[in-house]
Amino acid sequence: MEQREENTERIHRERRKRQSSSIPKTTTLLCPLDLILEILLRLPVKSVLRFRCVSKLWLSTTTDPYFTNSYEARSSTRPSLLMFFKNKDKLFVFTFPHHNQNSKETHSYSQHVDSYHIKYPKYCCFPFTESVHGLISFRISTKPIIWNPTMRQFLILPKPEKSWKGLSVFLGYDPVEGKHKLMCMNRDNTSDECRVLTLGSAQEKWRRIKSNLKHRSILRYYGQCINGVIYYQAYIDQMGFISNPTIMSFEVRSEKFDTITLPSGSFANMLIPYQGRLACVNNTMDDVNGGITLWTLEDAEKHIWSCKLFLAPLAHYDRSLKTDFKLDGITHAGEFIYVLSTFLKSFYVLYFDPKKNSFRKVEFRGTAYEVFRLSHGLGNKKVNRLYTFSHHVTSF
């Protein structure tokens, strides 16, 4: 890590020297490089990518590891909500920030959406997944795919194992080394090994990693990578008998497995990050007793969980909305994020603040315009499946 910082600083010293030497002596440098970088760090990512086409100097500046790391670090403190839906062979992608509101009143406002569309690889399968430090994983049959929404690029990776007919894919990120790793397992059978690939490595080869337990991931639930650890639900093979669901953890840096017992008598509809920790959410929709049970992992080694109960927040806001919205996650500020499962023209997001017991409604105008819909062949077609990622950040 220290070596990387030294190399980055050396690159900047050389660039300053090269830049100053190219300027005539009679010319005064009005804008120092440090100030330029600070300005660039505050710009939207779309503007930064455009500047790469201005000149070689701008390209060099905006692709320098110091700048990209700084930009990504700043973005990670302000995650966005990313959504997309499929139409024929294209993905229609929308991103917008989570705005914290201080008002105690239930209110709504509109916001324009940053959107684009992109053609995706043929036969691509879109399972439930998450955005991990700016990257999202999919698959084509038994070939994993990595998608970078910021750069609008897809990377198709080789098969991790030729004999596997089914594949479970988990994407992780090591914040210490700044590396993404892909961990894949046989989807159909219990196994005590997996395949791991480090993205961006020189040879990008799959490595065989042993687990301490034979297990199989539960397909209907996706994993979460939190602070360099991948968590996912699984069944453990105990001498030929399949156990009740448990949580497996995979530390991205050390590539070690461990198990975490679920809270007694509970199950998890979904795993989410909550205040920097793993949380299990049980979301029931019963009119009388419905609500959200949130179990937060306090100590992974001792399997200690804390519990909070939130009574049917959607029912208190509007009972008619319960079947239209789904819980997608929790913001850094502790607000529950509810998104529409389907929509026709415009769509909106509900944020519930349990501390203030208040809702705010954010309506987005990006798909409401008839010109937008007609120009992209959407017409009056209803979107029946909206994919959402509540903690998306920029990744170059």
UniProtKB/Swiss-Prot annotation:
Chain ranges of the F-box domain: 26-73
Where are the compositionally biased (Basic and acidic residues) regions? 1-12
InterPro entries assigned to the protein according to its UniProt record, in alphabetical order: F-box-assoc_dom_typ3, F-box-assoc_interact_dom, F-box-like_dom_sf, F-box_dom
Q: Which domain of life is it from?
A: Eukaryota
Q: Which residues form a coiled coil?
A: none
Gene3D superfamilies the record matches:
1.20.1280.50
Q: SUPFAM superfamilies, from UniProt?
A: F-box domain (SSF81383)
Annotated region described as Disordered, given as residue ranges:
1-20
| Protein name as annotated | Putative F-box protein At1g50870
